């Protein structure tokens, strides 16, 4: 029976392989770049995802937190998928994502030289292990400076690492703790070299020396023993270090440890990355009800976003998206108007914010207010065509125009 099923599957794959895929345009999340590294003596690639408003000229330029993801392009695809969906759902502030590639994870991510693998046996592919110091130099002196000259970052950085990449992320925490604000560890390979990272953490894990806030999210899986791998040492090393993390927790060193029952070492990255990023950026995504009160929304951002390196203002794009929803709610036009006026005041150089306010005022037949908003749009961007066209259509000053539908 099993043989027939395998044969049927093979024949099905053969039929599919012979079919011509329909023509279409590639769909990608980001761009790939090359960087020649002196520290590593080779050229590596890195990927960059930009959030929706970054290249939209209709929004005022701003800066964004940056998430650096080890094990690119695989882990980068996962993180950008999660991030892009959460941004679209207004569950995460807009961020930049950078994928970091390594030529040999067994060399680049391991802090010490060791020939002993996860199964406790000697492994020939570990002969070049112990290259983490050089890879850390590449990140610190070459990649991060290059990226942050290339994009508009706030200086607020997050590092994400899974498995051996999580081991390397701990190496970064212990050697250059102030390089990143957030550290997201997914079931890291802390068994390495007889728990070498755990021994170093006993002496070296402390609150940040720059006086800022550091956040650590550590996720663990529920890997069962198998003929290929006994996770006993792996799990014990993770329990040992997470206990230390929780003991060292302080106002400046925030820690969240989360175990995922039933999730194995590889797939646990999916829920862990979603949960970790949501926790890190919880201050950047206000609940919907705050958009019904412009004053409370502003207070939320002033109080919560300092840790994110943001401006402390509601994001222009988020307000632009939420305002029409609120306007469509029965009896909420006043709240929508307050939100649009807040956006225009917060982003005076954005023609889009002024035009959106003008459209709202025109829908209420407030020609005078709309004229004022459109004039502000043209002061911000003198040749802004949508603003100029709307202003030209307005009746002479003092007359009331017929209500118009909202448009861009």
Q: What are the roles of these predicted feature ranges?
A:
Residues 20-364, 376-378, 382-397:
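Non-catalytic cap/lid and distal C-terminal segments of serine-dependent acyl enzymes
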């Amino acid at each position: 029976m099993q043989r027939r099923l395998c044969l049927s599957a093979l024949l099905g794959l053969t039929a599919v392989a012979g079919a011509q895929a329909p023509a279409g345009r590639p769909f990608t999340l980001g761009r790939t770049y090359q960087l020649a590294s002196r520290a590593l003596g080779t050229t590596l690639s890195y990927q960059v995802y930009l959030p929706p408003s970054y290249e939209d000229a209709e929004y005022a330029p701003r800066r964004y937190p940056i998430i650096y993801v080890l094990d690119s392009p695989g882990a980068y695809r996962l993180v950008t998928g999660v991030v892009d969906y959460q941004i679209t759902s207004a569950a995460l502030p807009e961020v930049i994502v950078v994928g970091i590639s390594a030529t040999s994870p067994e060399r680049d991510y391991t802090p010490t030289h060791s020939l002993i693998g996860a199964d406790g046996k000697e492994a020939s592919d570990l002969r070049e292990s112990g290259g983490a110091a050089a890879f850390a130099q590449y990140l610190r002196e070459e990649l991060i400076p290059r990226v942050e000259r290339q994009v508009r970052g706030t200086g607020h950085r997050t590092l994400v690492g899974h498995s051996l990449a999580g081991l390397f992320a701990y190496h970064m925490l212990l050697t250059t703790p102030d390089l990143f604000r957030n550290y997201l560890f997914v079931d890291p390979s802390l068994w390495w070299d007889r728990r070498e990272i755990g021994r170093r953490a006993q002496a070296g894990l402390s609150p940040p020396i720059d006086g800022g806030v550091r956040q650590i999210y550590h996720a663990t899986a529920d890997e069962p023993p198998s003929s290929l791998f006994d996770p006993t040492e792996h799990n014990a090393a993770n329990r040992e270090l997470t206990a230390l993390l929780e003991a060292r927790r302080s106002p400046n060193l925030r820690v969240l440890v989360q175990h995922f029952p039933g999730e194995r070492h590889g797939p646990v990255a999916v829920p862990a990355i979603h949960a970790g990023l949501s926790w890190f950026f919880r201050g950047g995504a206000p609940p919907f009800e705050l958009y019904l009160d412009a004053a409370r929304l502003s207070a939320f951002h002033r109080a919560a976003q300092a840790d994110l390196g943001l401006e402390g203002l509601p994001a222009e794009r988020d307000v632009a998206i939420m305002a029409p929803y609120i306007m469509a709610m029965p009896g909420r036009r006043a709240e929508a108007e307050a939100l649009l006026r807040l956006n225009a005041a917060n982003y005076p150089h954005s023609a889009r914010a002024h035009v959106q306010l003008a459209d709202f005022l025109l829908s209420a037949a407030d020609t005078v207010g709309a004229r004022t908003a459109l004039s502000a749009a043209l002061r911000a961007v003198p040749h802004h065509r949508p603003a100029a066209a709307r202003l030209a259509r307005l009746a002479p000053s003092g007359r009331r125009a017929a209500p118009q539908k909202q448009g861009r």
